[in-house]
Amino acid sequence: MSGHNKWSTIKHKKGAADAKRGKIFTKLIKEITVAAKLGGGDPEGNPRLRTAIDKAKGENMPKDNIERAIKKGTGGMDGVVYEETTYEGYGPGGAAVLVEVMTDNRNRTVSDVRSIFTKCNGNMGESGCVSWMFDKKGLMVFPKSVDFDKLFEAAIEAGAEDVSDEEEQIEVTTDPVSFMEVRDTLEKAGFKPESAEVTMIPQTMVKLEGKQAENMLKLMDRMEDNDDVQNVYANFDISEEEMDKMM
């Protein structure tokens, strides 16, 4: 399994997604609001907004919530001002961790993030300490039922960098700039992804087991549970056998 999807697979197995739907909505509303503020309220001319709306629809967010978030971002409603930044550090076993936040109080957020690192046997580092271990890529995930050869041909012709046949899904990666163009081309050809986003993909993986694996999952859980944290990326790998021991 490719590393960037390890955490989402683990969350699915733990049944954590439904339990945290309220927090997911909060984070998505923030993302829609900021995307609309920075690039305007028309998703056709604002790729970041379009991606955020698609994610929200994928989580069954009501249309009214989406429209209110867009209106808030474009100045139609009063609201707080959010600042975006990324914190970096190391988790248990030296795993690299990137934490993307959107906050109205940087002092509060940096204190919270540092505390989570420390309590989970990790440590927060300086800016740039681990970001070089990740590549920013467009990622589209398709079900295994899709004809791989046809998708491969269409994706490469559309400008994708790679198409990989994973254990549970097919993944198409692109450079961030051409992500929306490749996605639109594939959708017009009849290939609709289950998920599509610009993400951070680790270049190498750190294998964890035992207490280190437990603490790493605790760190990821607590980071995602923080309202100011939008995304968490890490380069850890935990085997199926190790996961079974912890479940």
Curated annotation (Swiss-Prot):
Record keyword Transcription regulation present: yes
Domain of life: Bacteria
UniProt cross-references to InterPro entries, sorted A to Z: Integrase-like_N, TACO1_YebC-like_2nd/3rd_dom, TACO1_YebC_N, Transcrip_reg_TACO1-like, Transcrip_reg_TACO1-like_dom3, YebC-like
Subcellular location: Cytoplasm
GO biological process, alphabetically ordered: regulation of DNA-templated transcription
GO cellular component: cytosol
GO molecular function: DNA binding
Gene3D superfamilies associated with the record: 1.10.10.200, 3.30.70.980
Principal subcellular localization: cytoplasm
Keywords (A to Z) from UniProt: Cytoplasm, DNA-binding, Transcription, Transcription regulation
Family statement: Belongs to the TACO1 family.
PANTHER family for the chain: TRANSCRIPTIONAL REGULATORY PROTEIN YEBC-RELATED, TRANSLATIONAL ACTIVATOR OF CYTOCHROME C OXIDASE 1
Protein name in UniProt: Probable transcriptional regulatory protein Gura_1416
Native source organism of the sequence: Geotalea uraniireducens (strain Rf4) (Geobacter uraniireducens)
